[in-house]
Swiss-Prot record:
Belongs to the phenylalanyl-tRNA synthetase beta subunit family. Type 1 subfamily. Its EC number is 6.1.1.20. This is Phenylalanine--tRNA ligase beta subunit. InterPro entries: aa-tRNA-synth_II/BPL/LPL (IPR045864), B3/B4_tRNA-bd (IPR005146), DNA-bd_dom_put_sf (IPR009061), Fdx_antiC-bd (IPR005121), Fdx_antiC-bd_sf (IPR036690), NA-bd_OB-fold (IPR012340), Phe-tRNA-ligase_IIc_bsu (IPR045060), Phe-tRNA-ligase_IIc_bsu_bact (IPR004532). Mg(2+) binds at residues 453, 459, 462-463. Residues 713-806 form the FDX-ACB domain. Tetramer of two alpha and two beta subunits. Its cofactor is Mg(2+). It comes from Agrobacterium fabrum (strain C58 / ATCC 33970) (Agrobacterium tumefaciens (strain C58)). One of its GO terms (molecular function) is tRNA binding. The gene is pheT. The keyword Chaperone does not apply. GO terms for biological process: phenylalanyl-tRNA aminoacylation.
Length: 807
């Protein structure tokens, strides 16, 4: 929305400077996007083309002799199609900066002919996007004077960025009203138009619509005997300053009303209208040649104004060329109507038409100004074009039913925290045109017809707040969050974050997969229950809520493999679903490894089969990943038990279940069953795991939140290897537990590094090799100390498992 400073001051009595006005506009929610003081236009002068001859070396160029008022014509080479003798336009001499092309002119030769300047187009001056020809001014434009002064370009132009909910500020009068309400001046009011009316308007209007909301009102008046010449200089200057091209007085008046009062108008040449006017839906395939010289094909979704011969206008969007007004117009029909905002928006989008009328109608114009707008336009036509006004015809309009809001003034403080007095709140609302009835802390507020965006109490609070000024809100320090008791994050949230970090530290990459999977995959992982089917899935293969993270991770890994990335290690920490109630949603940390993506060091260090013969991933990689999550989450690993076997999607002999006690299942790990991989259409070597973070027991509450000091031993750790021959039925975990119990203070870790079965060991026997890490605490251990500890380890394993030390 553009307007000049002088135009604004026609409606606002104020001594405020340009900077003060712009600052206040932004403060009250009308953000100033640009201010153009037009200083760059001062060097341009009005000049007349004395002669125009064809360029000797170029068919599309002309050699002009241009008089700038000093009696010394200068030679200019010009390529504009409308360049001709007698044309009056804007001249830029050598040394002048032309903003639209970002060039400072100099004397030069064009195809061998010297040129001493430039006749400019509107686009070259950044006035508009029109570059079809050079500026063509009226013949009586004063040659030799400043073009900026003549065109009103020395008047600062303010452009504000309007939000769609403020149709009242698509008028300069509406902007002035907001500024006056904010205390920056006084709103000027004009007397109601007064003129003599003679005779009836001979054209009737019929509304033939199946939905009255498409055109809630239509008013029409004839003015006979007009003289449609150029509009006065003051009007032309204002229109040109905001980027509009003056055409003739009648058209310029409608454009002026659009910006001045926010009331789009339209004029028909009465002589070109045949019979009465009908407002109706367009017929399928009907066409109209519009004022932009383009033909549009219409349909039943478009509302049109038609006479007996055909279409004359696309209602609320653009008029037709056939009934347009020109210098020969004697009798004019002035239209002021109301249109459905949604239909206008759809019509404009479907036809690709953007006009100032559409911009206002699709946001909503003031319904109560339909007839006053007609009166004001009639007054301007009589003043500028002469003539005799006929009686107005008004059809369809049933009046505006205003909204009334019961408004407790205490809402201002409740919703904003602002300390605004009741007197100021009421003064602001009255200044904005709201009707206020009642006294005390609760009043009845009538919303004005030009504010369709105001609907309830919160909207009224917003009006008070923006005019009072958000700058008046005193800064308040935030509360002291250090005084908050207890943890801000829940235990589950902390464990979720910890699991992510633990798996990332093992070289795995985090993935985010869909929570929706195909029904076949859901059933493969013990899901597919009717309660977990989506009523409206986004795709046919996303019909069920996932019972496990693994199908999504496996298919994601396969997509990577298909693109040449065969060694993949990815994880996800998210939700799975066992039922349709909140307690049936699980928080799970899951991951898979493919190919040779085994952890071979710290960080993202994977072994690679192509570089050194890395081994394929196996059940032990998945086990290590799963246990790392439990350990990072602070579970007592001595109480964690591992049992053989897992759900059906795992390999029956290469998988395990992680438990804490006989009933608490913490998760599963292992290699995947070949049938599972086949059903998912994935290939390769895979292992994976899932840990149920919500199944972990709550940590015991400690007396203090302070962590104990970290104690590090100054002595070197020592590792000892043992190989025990045990029955095949003995689990490795039992051996680890027995070895650890030999001395929990000195033994800091026990790991299995080899399992061997062979005839040399005997029937149903196996060898389990473990590595025991011994960390001295307060002294260096002697050989006697190690021998005693070794004997205790061997004795504990033999007692617990029946195992003997392998020779």
């Amino acid at each position: 929305m553009k307007f000049t400073l002088s135009w604004l001051k026609e409606h606002l009595e104020t001594d405020a400077t340009l900077d003060e006005i712009c600052e206040r506009l932004t403060a009250i929610g009308l953000e100033v996007e640009d201010v153009d003081d037009k200083a760059a236009y001062k060097p341009f002068v009005i000049a007349k083309v004395v002669s125009a001859e064809k360029h000797p070396e170029a068919d599309r160029l002309k050699v002009l002799m241009v008089d700038a008022g000093d009696g010394k014509p200068v030679q200019i080479v010009c390529g504009a199609p409308n360049a001709r003798a007698g044309l009056v336009g804007a001249l830029a001499r050598p040394g002048v900066y032309v903003p639209g092309i970002d060039v400072t002119l100099a004397v030069g030769k064009i195809r061998g002919v010297e040129s001493h300047g430039m006749m400019c187009s509107e686009k070259e001056l950044n006035i508009s996007d029109d570059h079809d020809g050079i500026i063509d001014l009226p013949e009586d434009a004063p040659v030799g004077t400043s073009f900026a002064t003549y065109a009103g370009l020395d008047d600062p132009v303010i452009e504000i960025n309007l939000t769609p909910n403020r149709p009242d500020c698509t008028s300069i009068y509406g902007i002035a009203r907001d500024l006056a309400a904010s205390g920056l001046g006084k709103l000027k009011t004009k007397a109601a138009p007064s003129f003599k009316v003679e005779g009836a308007t001979p054209v009737d209007v019929k509304l033939e619509l199946d939905d009255a909301a498409l055109c809630p009102g239509f008013s029409l008046r004839i003015v006979r005997g007009v003289k449609n010449g150029p509009s006065p200089k003051w009007m032309q200057q204002r229109l040109m300053a905001i980027g509009l091209r003056p055409i003739n007085a009648l058209v310029d008046i409608t454009n002026y009303m659009t910006f001045d009062q926010g009331r789009p108008m339209h004029v028909f040449d009465a002589a070109k209208v045949k019979g009465d006017l009908t407002v109706r839906r367009a017929k399928d395939g009907e066409t109209i040649l519009a004022l932009d010289q383009r033909e549009y094909k219409l349909g039943p979704n478009n509302v049109v104004i038609a006479d007996e011969k055909g279409l004359e206008s696309i209602g609320g969007v653009m008029g037709g060329e056939h009934s347009g007004c020109d210098e020969n117009t004697i009798d004019v029909l002035i239209e002021s109507a109301l249109w459905d905002p949604i239909n206008i928006a759809k019509t404009g989008r479907s036809l690709g038409i953007i006009t100032d009328a559409r911009y206002r109608f699709e946001r909503g114009v003031d319904p109560e100004y339909m007839v006053p707008g007609l009166e004001r336009t009639t007054e301007l036509v009589l003043e500028l074009c002469g003539g005799i006004a006929g009686e107005a015809k008004i059809v369809g309009y049933k009046g505006h039913q205003p909204k009334v809001v019961d408004f407790p003034l205490s809402e201002v403080k409740r919703l904003t925290g602002l300390e605004v007095s009741s007197e100021e709140s009421l003064a602001i609302l009255k200044g904005l045109g709201f009707g206020v009835e009642g006294t005390g802390e609760r009043v009845s507020v009538t919303v004005p017809s030009w504010r369709p965006d105001v609907d309830g109490k919160a909207d009224l609070v917003e009006e008070v707040m923006r005019i009072h000024g958000v700058d008046n809100i005193k800064p308040e320090p935030l509360e002291n969050f250090g005084a908050v008791n207890g943890r801000i994050l829940t235990t589950l949230q902390i464990r979720t974050r910890t699991a992510r970090r633990a798996l990332a530290s093992r070289g795995m990459l985090e993935a985010v997969t869909w929570s929706f999977i195909p029904e076949a995959q859901a059933k493969l992982f013990s899901g597919g229950s009717p309660a977990l089917k989506l009523a409206n899935p986004i795709a046919a293969d996303m019909s069920d809520m996932r019972p496990s993270l693994l199908p999504g991770l496996l298919t994601a890994a396969q997509r990577n493999a298909d693109k040449g990335h065969g060694d993949v290690a990815i994880f996800e920490v998210s939700g799975t679903y066992e039922g349709d109630t909140p307690e049936k949603q699980r928080r799970v940390a899951g991951g898979i490894r493919r190919g040779t993506a085994s952890l071979a060091g710290s960080g993202r260090m994977w072994s690679n089969a192509a570089k050194g013969g890395g081994k394929p991933v196996d059940v032990y990689d998945a086990k290590a990943d799963a246990l790392s999550v439990l350990e990072a989450c602070g579970l007592p690993m001595a109480n964690v038990q591992i049992e053989a076997g897992a759900p059906a999607w795992y390999h029956p002999g290469r998988s395990g279940t992680i438990k804490m006690g006989p009933k608490v299942v913490l998760g599963y790990f292992g290699e995947f069953h070949p049938k599972t991989l086949s059903e998912l259409d994935v290939s390769g070597t895979y292992c994976g795991f899932e840990i149920y973070l919500d199944a972990m027991p709550e940590p015991k509450k400690k007396a203090t939140r302070t962590k104990p000091a970290l104690e590090l031993s100054p002595f070197q750790a020592v590792k000892r290897d043992f190989a025990f021959v045990v029955d095949k039925s003995v689990e490795a975990g039992a051996i680890i537990k027995a070895a650890t119990s030999a001395d929990r203070k000195l033994i800091t870790g026990v790991n299995v590094f080899d399992i061997f079965e062979g005839a040399s060991l005997g029937e149903n026997r196996k060898s389990v090799a473990i590595e025991v890490q011994i960390q001295p605490v307060d002294k260096t251990l002697t050989d006697e100390d190690f021998e005693a500890l070794t004997a205790k380890i061997v004795g504990n394993v033999e007692k617990s498992t029946g195992g003997v030390l392998r020779a």
